[in-house]
Amino acid sequence: MLILGLTGSIATGKSTVSREFQEKYHIKIIDADVLARKVVEPNTPCLIKIQKEFGNEVLHEDGTLNRAKLGQAVFQDAGKRSLLNSIIHPAVRLEMLKELLRCYVRGYSIVILDVPLLFEAKMQFICWKTICVSCDKSIQKQRLLARNPELTAEDAENRVQAQMPLELKCQLADIVIENNSDLETLYENIHNVLPLITPSYFFTLLCLILPPLQITLQVIAFVSQKKKVSEFRKHI
């Protein structure tokens, strides 16, 4: 089973790419955003920690997480954002590993981890290849403002700047899918990526019946991604 990581930045089209992989090509997607919502359900350890660190004001009256309030608390405070990530990321990683184990047992040939903060959360180290969805910064802002008309141009800029620079993500990624044009062009770019990420049936079968092969594959992926990060740091 090949594990791939899919990431991007806000309004670059990552969700569209993820949906196309899943709906047209029937590739299993594990969505980190879905898992992130799961780990902060009422009475979960994560939500209890968040309440302790950020106060009762980040909860609704029914005990569910008030995402708007929490977002306001961490959006422009890097320290609080880092604290929140330190609470949520480990729990999401654990849920993701559980999902990956289920996928392996069920014989999936390929699984894509849809993770907005793939590199920030260091999730690339379990991926054989990483994919970043990219677009020009001006197009990114236009899409963000069109999607969220309540935002000002300054708000859009702040949201873009709050994330790891997209150019850095592209440098860290193994594959970049450009999304600077229309949907038809994007779908063509996705189609062109498939030969680079699709394992053979024979390889999938071998990984399933020979667990040591899957373990070896993961070790190779870890070493490869580590090497890529090390090389990247030498040039910054």
From Swiss-Prot:
Gene3D superfamilies tied to this protein: P-loop containing nucleotide triphosphate hydrolases
A Gene Ontology BP annotation from the UniProt entry: coenzyme A biosynthetic process
Residues reported to bind ATP: G8, S9, I10, A11, T12, G13, K14, S15
Localization in the cell: Cytoplasm
UniProt keyword Cytoplasm, yes or no: yes
Domain DPCK: 3-208
Keywords (A to Z) from UniProt: ATP-binding, Cytoplasm, Nucleotide-binding, Phosphoprotein
GO MF entry, a single one: ATP binding
Modified residues (Phosphoserine): S82, S86
Family designation: Belongs to the CoaE family.
Name of the protein described by the UniProt record: Uncharacterized protein C14G10.01
